[in-house]
Regions:
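Short beta-strand-to-loop elements that line the ligand-binding cleft
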Residues: 76-83, 147, 164-175
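A ligand-binding cleft/hinge motif common to bilobed small-molecule-binding domains
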Residues: 86-89, 103-111, 156-159, 180-181, ...
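Flexible hinge/capping segments at coil-to-helix
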Residues: 119, 128-145
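Periplasmic-binding protein-like
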Residues: 120-128, 174, 191, 195-237, ...
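Ligand-binding clefts/hinges and TM-proximal coupling segments of bilobed small-molecule sensing domains
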Residues: 152-169, 206-208, 236-263
Length: 263
């Protein structure tokens, strides 16, 4: 009997040691619900996804999407403003729980973060004045093209035209300002964002030159948080069925939600 008890005690001790790391590392979904707050990184300079209104309040498609997430979780929402290049670093250093800032998927990014199902449909392209005869990456020549560093358009443009005169800025607002002021002849940006820019800057031409790629937006989280990812996918599926995402597309993107490609 003593031998049996000693063996049982040893098994229990080993089991406790194995389970301890799992218990110490709470899963992110449970952690958010336990704390009662979800921290979401968003843009403050990329209308209509995220920008500051006249009252200096954040508004836009991604802001409303973050509110939808917080409401469905039953927690408070903490919005964290980030430039494009800081979206993944903020996730990796646990400054935010998730990123909802018009991020499109790439294989390189997937080495660092996990992507939810797509929640918004957009595309990336190059724009400039009507007088510029640019119809592809091969036509860029000596024309300087500006892009926000770390964005998908930066990655695609660099691969497409590595020898082009690419001006990379720290954030989207600076990239737009460089184009508006004439420091760059072309702008690589999200087509939905450019529609909004054209409305706000009627004296500047935003003529479509060529497409870079279709770029649906995804919520991103840290790798390994599978429970949170499954929950986000469920929310996006539900919001597609009940019309919430279509409503956001009509409100912010100017039209109905098109069918999005599966992951």
């Amino acid at each position: 009997m003593i031998g049996f008890r000693a063996a049982l005690a040893a098994v229990i001790a080993v089991s406790a040691a194995l389970l301890a790391p799992l218990e110490a590392r709470a899963d992110k979904l449970s952690d958010i619900i336990s704390k009662g707050v979800v921290r979401v990184s968003v843009f403050a300079d990329v209308p209509p996804f995220g920008s500051l209104n006249a009252n200096r309040e954040l508004e836009g498609f991604d802001i409303d999407m973050a509110k939808l997430v917080a409401k469905a979780m039953g927690v408070k929402l903490e919005l964290v403003q980030v430039p494009a290049a800081s979206r993944i670093p903020f996730l990796m250093t646990d400054k935010v729980d998730m990123n909802i800032a018009a991020m499109s998927i790439t294989a390189e990014r997937a080495l660092q973060v996990m992507f939810s199902a797509p929640y918004a449909d957009t595309s990336l392209a190059v724009f400039g004045s009507k007088s510029l005869g640019v119809a592809s990456g091969a036509d860029l020549g000596k024309n300087r093209i500006v892009v926000a560093k770390g964005t998908t358009e930066d990655l695609v443009l660099t691969a497409l035209a590595p020898k082009a005169d690419i001006m990379r800025t720290e954030d989207n607002a600076t990239a737009v300002q460089a184009y508006l002021s004439g420091h760059a002849q072309l702008l690589a940006a999200n087509s939905v964002v450019v529609v909004e820019l054209a409305k706000r800057n009627p004296d500047k031409e935003f003529d479509f030159k060529f497409a870079l790629r279709r770029a649906p937006a995804h919520i991103t989280i840290r790798r390994g948080e599978h429970d949170l990812l499954r929950w986000l996918d469920t929310l996006i599926f539900q919001s597609t069925l009940n019309g919430d995402l279509d409503e956001l597309h009509r409100k912010w993107l100017g039209g109905p939600m098109r069918p999005l490609p599966p992951m």
